[in-house]
């Protein structure tokens, strides 16, 4: 069963067929980046985990 979501990071909109693929991508970003980039990835990751269907980095 798919759970599509949309992420908006650095102004770029990306459609994901599966929420958990997006979670994995942004989790990796949180673990490997620092500073403002890490904060952006964290914002999106938390929104994904909260069940939102459109998640931005702001």
PLM regions with names:
Residues 1-36, 53:
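N-terminal acidic leader/helix
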Residues 38-46:
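Short, charged, amphipathic alpha-helical segments
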Residues 48, 52-55:
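TPR/TPR-like alpha-solenoid repeats
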């Amino acid at each position: 069963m798919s759970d599509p979501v949309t992420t908006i990071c650095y102004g770029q909109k990306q459609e994901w067929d599966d929420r958990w693929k997006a979670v994995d991508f942004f989790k990796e970003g949180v673990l490997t980046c620092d500073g403002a980039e890490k904060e952006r990835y964290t914002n999106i990751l938390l929104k994904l985990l909260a069940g939102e269907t459109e998640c931005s980095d702001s």
